[in-house]
Amino acid sequence: MSTSAAATLPLSVISKNLRKVFLSQKTRKIDWRYSQLKAIKKMMSENKDNITAAVKKDLGKHEFEIHQTEIVMIQTELDETISHLESWNKTEKVYSPLHFKPASSYILKEPLGVVLIMSPWNYPVNLALIPLIGAIAGGNCALLKLSRHSYNISKLLHGLLTKYLDPECFEFDCEGGAPYITELLEYKWDHIFFTGSVKVGKIVYQAAAKFLTPVTLELGGKNPCIVDKDTDIKLTARRLIWGKCWNAGQTCIGLDYLIVHKSILEPLIEEFKVVLKEFFGEDIKKSTSFARIISSAAAERLQQLFSMGKVVIGGEADIAERYIAPTVIVDPDLDSPLMQDEIFGPVLPIVTYENIDECLEFIQNRPHALTLYLFSRDQAIQDKVLDGTQSGSLMINDTLLHFTNPNLPFGGIGDSGIGSYHGKGTFDIFVHKRGLVQSTTKKFLDLPLRYPPYTPFSDNVAGKILGSGW
């Protein structure tokens, strides 16, 4: 039996209880929101070492990677939200047209209600807590479904969140599998925030459509990286290897494949070899700076990709230890899973091009990426790529860092997702902007010409008030 509170009661009861608490208006109070945000901050501060150890056990990541993505980013999001919550939540007075006078117009920021958040295993703290922070800031109740694949950190988070947060307003699950998720989607939620694969994202979207439930879908896909001939090969190689090997390539914004100018392919590959040795030593498997794959099954899937092109670097695997070496593949089969499916591992296929138009056509004929990368010092090339492509984000001459900026919207387009978040964007997802017009009851200000019977005079006056479009 699941240890989670969300699994010990029928979902019908959980849904009803959360709805009842929301309707009590408890979560609307700004003091309650601050108290819950500060509780998460306290939880992170008091349990940093335990969180680090649990993530390390699941993914084999170095403490540096864990701290940057699972600790620091949460602290940044909390600080940003706590500092600005009052101003974000403030009612806005907006201009009222002449025919409204003396009425006043406002935009209210109101909670959505009871929301469902479904988080993945690859960044199990970050991708669970940042949406939850937004849901709390917006004044909502929430059910958070943690991934059972990152079992150690999900189990720890389940216990900590249950301890630190208001138990009436939240439910957490860390063990429910596909049947539980299927049942979750049979209930009406006021918003669903899902992070995961395109395949499951489509299932979530279809289920939400039954209730016209709004969704945020943070998906993945194949993120291309263009490497122009006008680039610093040494610096480019360092940033590419760093971006591809962070979390052993298990990153939704990770570069999935390279499109390299034919003239620099060989020197770039040689520089990759130098950088890999510098970063991880002679035996990468022994390096504490290189993470492990989440499961043996995932490692086996990645190993199968080795045969779908020519391996020029790497190609080693230890399935029992969930180890896949950083592997570079040239001449990949374009119709194979290597070039059709999201890789989600340290396997990097390379295709080549000779002119930028050919390169852009290759990208345009594929689903829109969550992130597109470009390495080039040529401003004309940068402009052409920016104007000639669509993607959730575009990063030029570096990798991954855009994800850490709370002032940038993070999200996809098309197959890579719906909606964006981080910073104020996370708050905006979880509130409804409700229009309010407050009119007068003073009879002497009630213009008679608005009422029937209408006359040419009333039509003429209305035209002058409302403008030429009347």
From Swiss-Prot:
CC per GO annotation: cytoplasm; lipid droplet
InterPro entries: Ald_DH/histidinol_DH, Ald_DH_C, Ald_DH_CS_GLU, Ald_DH_N, Aldehyde_DH_dom, Aldehyde_DH_NAD(P)
Keywords: Cytoplasm, NAD, Oxidoreductase
Catalytic activity: an aldehyde + NADP(+) + H2O = a carboxylate + NADPH + 2 H(+); an aldehyde + NAD(+) + H2O = a carboxylate + NADH + 2 H(+)
EC number: 1.2.1.5
Biological process annotations from GO: aldehyde metabolic process; sorocarp development
Main location: cytoplasm
Active site: 218, 252
Localisation: Cytoplasm
Keyword Phosphoprotein: no
Transmembrane segments annotated in the record for this chain: none
GO MF: 3-chloroallyl aldehyde dehydrogenase activity; aldehyde dehydrogenase (NAD+) activity; aldehyde dehydrogenase (NADP+) activity
Positions contributing to NAD(+) binding: 196-201
Family to which this protein belongs: Belongs to the aldehyde dehydrogenase family.
Listed name of the protein: Aldehyde dehydrogenase family 3 comG
Organism whose genome encodes this protein: Dictyostelium discoideum
Gene name of this polypeptide: comG
